[in-house]
Design a protein with these regions (language model features):
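Ligand/cofactor pocket segment of small-molecule handling proteins
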Residues: 106-141
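Acidic, glycine-rich flexible loop/linker segments
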Residues: 140-178
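Buried hydrophobic positions in well-ordered alpha/beta secondary-structure cores of metabolic enzymes
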Residues: 21, 109, 167-169
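Protein maturation boundaries and topogenic segments
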Residues: 23-32, 105, 112, 121
């Protein structure tokens, strides 16, 4: 879909997009949208509409690849592809111990073309993220702990959704649909 057409979808909230999808395909009444409670940092900004850049993280397991090596590969992956983008990060732990998302990663992802993040993990540094960058997360955490990227560009499942790399997503204060 062309960039300007994507921007036009920001005029609609996510429930309206869900209604339209349900008219086109009744299976969207039970799939494709978030079904769990989450925290929305900026409820008043326009909805995010963009292409998914997926990853899995862990704060209890660590990747065999060096931390800096996999992060650089991941940032190159996020930089590739069509704009705009939405980072979709699956935390492999039911109760996240640390936050991948804060001032540093929000600014890096913003510069790489991401409008925000959808994660079942935690976020922090709320007062210093870029102005129109959105956090839709399961929880807040004061610590980044020792979070490792485990893999990226793969399918992730959380909050009742299944999202693949490059899926088109619409998300706002109400939730997300892909």
């Amino acid at each position: 879909m062309k960039y300007k057409k994507l921007l036009k979808l920001q005029r609609f909230d996510t429930p309206t997009i869900c209604n339209g999808l349900e008219l086109l395909d009744a299976s969207f009444k039970i799939k494709g949208y978030s079904k769990e409670k989450f925290f929305c940092l900026n409820p008043k900004i326009k909805p995010m509409v963009g292409y998914a850049k997926t990853a899995k993280i862990s704060s209890l397991k660590h990747n065999k690849k060096t931390k800096n090596s996999i992060r650089m590969d991941y940032y190159e992956y996020v930089n590739e592809g069509d704009y705009p983008k939405i980072s979709v990060i699956y935390d492999q732990h039911k109760n996240p111990v640390g936050s991948f998302w804060g001032e540093v990663n929000a600014n890096i992802h913003h510069k790489l073309g991401c409008l925000g993040v959808i994660t079942n993990g935690s976020v922090r540094d709320l007062d210093v993220i870029p102005k129109n960058f959105q956090f839709l997360s399961k929880t807040l955490s004061p610590s980044h702990a020792e979070v490792s990227l485990m893999e990226f560009g793969t399918k992730v499942k959380f909050m009742g959704m299944e999202i693949k790399d490059n899926d088109l997503i619409h998300a706002d204060v109400h939730g997300a649909v892909s």
